[in-house]
């Protein structure tokens, strides 16, 4: 279902290596023509050192042709440079096998002090640090993400504060951990990178905006795979003004992921009101079945529309790389939202009518409601004789009302800040693309 596919938008804010898993997913789902996807992969690979992979893709594209000489020659060059860099960095890498030095790495965070120790005891020269960074990035470009992560860790341990490559090294380390699916370590690197970005007082407004936008997109890999991720994405995006502003200004399509996280997170039900306000405000710039489902249900109280959007949501979820694993949780919670909202309005409703709204048989609907009541997920009771469900009435606590009013003030402040940001953007004529050594890639063949 290419209509709602976001890969082309996401790719603009991802390192090219992070785009590969998305393309593999699209290939399995058969959303696009396979030939076009293979051409896209080959284009992606053109600026990497994964020559063997590029050869395989080329053979898939052109099975009757010989592999181009340029690829064969590039492979020879890559192997030679890899050996050269390995030889140049061997002395500094071997230092991390020294127990005394390893103990110092664990006990101090002063890279300059550690490097002075290496200069005194192992005759390591300052220029070797740049070579170590180059070797780490070369390993990454070859697709050796475990090697890249290890050498970037070494580099960051030794790099002095303010080193020009430190920020790039953090991006590279995060990308490597994501591609190895080390979600706990990736979350640590994500938080570390966020702290560095937010503490950079010398960065301009536009640079910070772009870096936050990149961080939001990269974080999706972590948030939709880590056990705590669906809580963390809500805290990052909905309740940190600078990140909400980044979404409103640069990437409103991220609302799909925020909305899914809220719907599938039973403990965060109170944030629905704030989320719906954001969705309403941004509906003129972005909407899809997932955001429209909440609009139908909580803004328009259009239950037929919500039911229709829920069916569309299932297709969107199954064809979204980040959300496919959320499908069952989403459908279950979305049905509960429809049920609660409908019963809250009507107080008493026939099970047969409810079954129709939930796209179930009356027997399935009754069993579903009984299970909700039994598991204490719902304050309601069933009148078996009349075939009715009667909802209980719960008044919100004073404490909860105070919290919601406070959040409303915070939200209004965020909206005001976002409007100012947009006005500044229009006055400046838009944003220039920003890219570091870990560059984004725009897969144009997926543009709708």
Swiss-Prot record:
It is found in: Cytoplasm. GO terms for molecular function: translation initiation factor activity. One of its GO terms (biological process) is formation of cytoplasmic translation initiation complex. Keywords: Cytoplasm, Initiation factor, Protein biosynthesis. One of its GO terms (cellular component) is nucleus. Coiled coil: none annotated. Pfam families: eIF3_N, EIF3E_C, PCI. InterPro entries: eIF3e, eIF3e_N, PCI_dom, WH_DNA-bd_sf. Residues 225-396 form the PCI domain. PANTHER family: EUKARYOTIC TRANSLATION INITIATION FACTOR 3 SUBUNIT E. HAMAP family: eIF3e. Belongs to the eIF-3 subunit E family. Component of the eukaryotic translation initiation factor 3 (eIF-3) complex, which is involved in protein synthesis of a specialized repertoire of mRNAs and, together with other initiation factors, stimulates binding of mRNA and methionyl-tRNAi to the 40S ribosome. The eIF-3 complex specifically targets and initiates translation of a subset of mRNAs involved in cell proliferation. Component of the eukaryotic translation initiation factor 3 (eIF-3) complex. This is Eukaryotic translation initiation factor 3 subunit E. It comes from Nematostella vectensis.
């Amino acid at each position: 279902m290419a209509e709602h596919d976001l890969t082309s938008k996401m790719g603009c804010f991802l390192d090219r290596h992070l785009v590969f898993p998305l393309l593999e997913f699209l290939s399995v789902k058969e959303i696009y023509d396979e030939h076009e996807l293979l051409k896209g992969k080959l284009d992606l690979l053109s600026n990497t050192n994964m020559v063997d992979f590029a050869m395989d893709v080329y053979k898939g594209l052109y099975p009757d042709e010989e592999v181009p000489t340029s690829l064969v020659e590039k492979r020879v060059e890559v192997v030679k440079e890899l050996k050269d860099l390995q030889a140049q960095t061997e002395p500094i890498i071997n230092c991390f096998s020294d127990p005394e030095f390893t103990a110092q790495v664990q006990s101090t965070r002063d890279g300059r002090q550690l490097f002075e120790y290496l200069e005194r005891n192992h005759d390591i020269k300052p220029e070797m640090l740049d070579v170590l960074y180059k070797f780490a990035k070369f390993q990454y470009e070859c697709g050796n993400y475990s090697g890249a992560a290890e050498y970037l860790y070494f580099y960051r341990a030794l790099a002095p504060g303010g080193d020009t490559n430190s920020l790039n090294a953090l991006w590279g380390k995060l990308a490597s951990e994501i591609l190895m699916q080390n979600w706990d370590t990736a979350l640590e690197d994500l938080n570390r990178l966020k702290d560095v970005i937010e503490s950079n007082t010398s960065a301009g407004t536009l640079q910070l905006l772009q870096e936050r936008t990149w961080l939001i997109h990269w974080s999706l890999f972590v948030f939709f795979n880590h056990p705590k991720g669906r809580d963390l994405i809500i805290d990052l995006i909905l309740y940190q003004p600078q990140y909400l502003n980044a979404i409103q200004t640069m990437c409103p399509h991220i609302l799909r992921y925020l909305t899914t996280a809220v719907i599938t997170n039973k403990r965060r039900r109170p944030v629905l009101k704030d989320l719906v306000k954001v969705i309403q405000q941004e509906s003129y710039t972005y909407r899809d079945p997932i955001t429209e489902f909440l609009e139908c249900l909580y803004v328009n109280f259009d239950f037929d529309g919500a039911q229709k959007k829920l069916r569309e949501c299932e297709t969107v979820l199954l064809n979204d790389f980040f959300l496919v694993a959320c499908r069952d949780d989403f459908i279950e919670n979305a049905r509960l939202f429809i049920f609660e909202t409908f019963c809250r309005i009507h107080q008493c409703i026939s099970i047969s009518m409810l079954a129709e709204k939930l796209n179930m048989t009356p027997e399935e609907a009754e069993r579903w409601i009984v299970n909700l009541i039994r598991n204490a997920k719902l304050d309601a009771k069933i009148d078996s004789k009349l075939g009715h469900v009667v909802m209980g009435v719960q008044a919100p606590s004073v404490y909860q009302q105070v919290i919601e009013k406070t959040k409303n003030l915070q939200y209004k402040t965020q909206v005001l800040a976002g409007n100012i940001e947009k006005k500044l953007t229009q006055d400046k004529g838009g944003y220039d693309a920003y890219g570091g050594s870990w560059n984004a890639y725009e897969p144009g063949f997926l543009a709708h």
